Amino acid sequence: NAAQIIVCDGNFHGRTTTIISFSNDQNARKNFGPYTEGFINIAYDDLEALENVLSSSSNIAGFLVEPIQGEAGVYVPSEGYLSKAKALCEKYNVLFIADEVQTGIARTGKLLAINHENVQADILILGKAISGGVYPVSAVLANDAVMNVIKPGQHGSTFGGNPVAAAVAIAALEVIQEEKLA
């Protein structure tokens, strides 16, 4: 189990034990633990740091990034950062994982923040806004290369496949499309 995931300083991906393991927010980490290993922190919006880590280890499985950092103070990356980061991930055969919980579903003028740079994530994390804020819904979407690794019965959740949540999410997405909100 030598696989590692690159994450960015100032990130916010939630408050579970694994996630706070690589958080810089000491309030989130205080009084919790033990922490999960396997994460490498780099500066946000720093392509040189990303390539340095990618080129120095064959154990990197993914790069997890918020297209726009929210909790850190709403940091918008330099133009081209996301597309160049995605290209580096492809070069080193590493998954590009976009956490769009705070930015997704038309919050930035496009359906997804990564759409501003025509980036397609290998794994896309969505939440909150996918239902228009009226029902708790989240989703993890991935390409075939990722999803075909998971066999039926290997992954699940207590509330996965909730038909009410799915109907609400579909209705919210239809409104966004019909009203051209993204």
Language-model-detected regions and their locations in the chain:
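Conserved N-terminal phosphate-binding loop of PLP-dependent enzymes in the Aspartate aminotransferase
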Residues: 1-182
